[in-house]
Amino acid sequence: MNFRHRSYQSELLDQPDIPFEDIQRNMEELNFINTWLGGHAITLTGVEALVNARQPITICEIGCGGGDNLVAIQKWCKKKNIPVAFIGIDINPHCIDVASKRTLSNIQLIHSDYKDAQLEKQPDIIFSSLFCHHFSDREMVKQLQWMKSNARLGFFINDLHRHKVAYYSIKVLTKMFSNSYLVKHDAPLSVARGFTKDEWLQFFNFAGISNYSIEWKWAFRWLVVYKNADTRNIKPE
């Protein structure tokens, strides 16, 4: 496989007719992977980069899935004594149904394409995790612009680094340990659909956005953080 360019092969999870039981199993295994390979820790690092002291914050996740990231953030905010409200947006109704059963307080769940979501209030922070690689390059530029326009403090992205070591490692691990045909097929493909640092730089350049950082994180993730340059002048609503 050539990792110089992104794969645009469709993931099974993006098909509209996947049975709910299969989606649920997929989400359970992804949560396990995020827990043990540091995915949730990267998300918490992104939150920490954007929070203002202990002021109340509203955090919105686009492509929220079953709400695992939001649960991890809620636990972190509780330890830090940070009052937090959540918005979770997902185009898949099964994901919203699973998220609605999580122990999340003060949350608005929206079944919608993120671009069409009707937000009750402007989020302080918008983020996504393992979401961006589902989109084309052109869609990614528009997504960055949408996140910038709708977040008061800034946004962050936790997504995959396209690399042959990551690809073959996850391919072997999921073949050995996964019980989900979705994970076995989509996990290595997700890496092949992931990004290089140069591609992120190009996306931000085309989007006309500055004041951002791109950090490589184990295991083969990018943490991309944009901070609103006027954050110091923003007061809580």
Predicted regions mapped to residue ranges:
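A conserved beta-strand element that flanks and buttresses the S-adenosyl-L-methionine
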Residues: 127
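Conserved Class I S-adenosyl-L-methionine
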Residues: 193, 197-228, 237
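N-terminal, positively charged/glycine-rich alpha-helical extensions of SAM-dependent methyltransferases
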Residues: 1-28
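C-terminal alpha-helical "lid/dimerization" subdomain adjacent to the S-adenosyl-L-methionine
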Residues: 160-204
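A short, conserved alpha-helix within the catalytic core of class I
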Residues: 135-146
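Class I SAM-dependent methyltransferase SAM/SAH-binding core
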Residues: 60, 66-116
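Class I SAM-dependent methyltransferase Rossmann-like catalytic core
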Residues: 20-46, 50
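Conserved beta-strand signature within the Rossmann-like core of class I S-adenosyl-L-methionine
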Residues: 152-160
